[in-house]
Design a protein with these regions (language model features):
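Extracellular beta-strand-rich solenoid/capping regions of secreted or surface-exposed proteins
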Residues: 96-98, 141-154, 162-178, 186-209, ...
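Short, small-residue-biased leader/transition segments that mark boundaries at the very start
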Residues: 1-2, 293-296
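An acidic-aromatic substrate-binding cleft motif
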Residues: 124-147
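All-beta strand scaffolds that present successive hydrophobic residues in beta-strands
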Residues: 136, 149, 155-158, 176-179, ...
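Short glycine/acidic-rich loop motifs that flank beta-strands on beta-rich extracellular proteins
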Residues: 144-146, 164-168, 186-191, 219-226, ...
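A structural signal for beta-strand register positions
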Residues: 159, 181-182, 187, 215, ...
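Beta-strand-enriched, solvent-exposed domains that form extended recognition/catalytic surfaces
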Residues: 3-131
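Active-site-proximal loop/turn and secondary-structure-junction residues that shape catalytic pockets
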Residues: 228, 238, 253-255, 275-277
């Protein structure tokens, strides 16, 4: 009997080398070589990964927005999603001009190429509250490892800040994670790793939780995970993952969870509601369980 050796392409390295060099400056985050974006005539930073590019216009109100997108290579067709936004672009050579009647989260695809989308993720400005326990300032990079959040604490990411690491909360009633900065996982898991690392935000046994305005990018595993929590509000959050197990939001054994006006790009589950055997002392309490999603956008790739 004749056997042939067959080479199998492995997408992910099962034993990747660990990353030893953290990010030191915001400028070190890779910028898009394909897209330049202007909003109201002002150039915005367009970030790049090997799976998508993204830009985060932070806005103060619901006024219309005018955009110009300059593309560094020729293209034949441009499509905006979701289709119901009905974006009508004027195309001149490699440049597109269009207007959003109100701030929204849209995707630009060129020539049907799903590997080079541009995510335009308009996000409302989140004002800094008077009480902030963990402040991450604009223009700075923070390598936090695991940030432990306690009850009644507020985490605030200013626009232009980049936080590398993950957030963990246990019995952190009244916790808040707010702002318009970026929680980025690219430097604490290897690019080709699948299923490695910890959830980017993990909350267990927490009540009265609010996550608003932040952008989460390229975690090594699940991104936003409330477990055995109740009264959770997720608003205007952007989540973009690359790895195969990079779920967007996993709601595990929770009560009264509301998601609104958020964007999720995932290679696995965008939003997944799960059950788990948490020893919840409130398990026998009579309660109406609600999980509500309003004006959210999801994209599976």
């Amino acid at each position: 009997m004749l056997f042939r050796s067959v080479k199998v392409a492995v997408r992910y390295n099962p034993n990747p080398a660990r990353i030893t060099e953290p990010l030191y400056k915001v400028e070190e985050l890779e910028k898009s070589p394909l897209y330049t974006v202007l909003c109201g005539g002002k150039e915005l930073t367009v970030y790049h990964t090997d799976s998508f590019d993204y830009v985060i216009p932070v806005v103060d109100d619901d006024s219309p927005l005018s955009f110009q997108v300059k593309v560094s290579k020729d293209f034949q067709k441009a499509v905006f999603r979701p289709a119901k936004t009905n974006v009508q672009a004027q195309i001149s050579g490699r440049e597109l001009s269009f207007q959003l009647e109100k701030p929204s989260k849209v995707t630009l695809e060129l020539d049907g190429n799903l590997k080079t989308p541009l995510f335009i993720l308009c996000t409302k400005r989140v004002p800094k509250p008077e009480k902030v326990d963990h402040l991450f300032e604009s223009g700075k990079v923070y390598n936090v490892g695991t940030l432990e959040v306690k009850a009644e604490e507020t985490v605030f990411l200013e626009e232009g800040s980049v936080v590398c690491g993950c957030v963990n909360a246990f019995f952190a009633h009244g916790m808040r994670i707010l702002g318009n900065g970026i929680l980025n996982g690219c430097v604490w898991h290897p690019k080709e790793e699948n299923g490695g690392g910890r959830p980017m935000i993990r909350m267990v046994f927490c009540d009265d939780v609010k996550i608003q305005g932040i952008t989460m990018v390229d975690g090594g595993s699940w991104h936003l995970v409330p477990g055995a929590c109740w009264n959770v509000e997720i608003e205007d959050v952007n989540i973009m993952s690359r790895v195969c197990t990079g779920d967007g939001i996993d709601i595990v054994g929770c009560e009264d969870v509301t998601m609104r006006n958020s964007f999720i790009r995932a290679s696995d589950d965008c939003v997944c509601i799960k059950a788990a055997s948490y020893p919840d002392p409130a398990a026998n309490r009579r309660s109406e369980e609600r999980r509500v999603g309003k004006e959210c956008r999801s994209r599976w790739s």
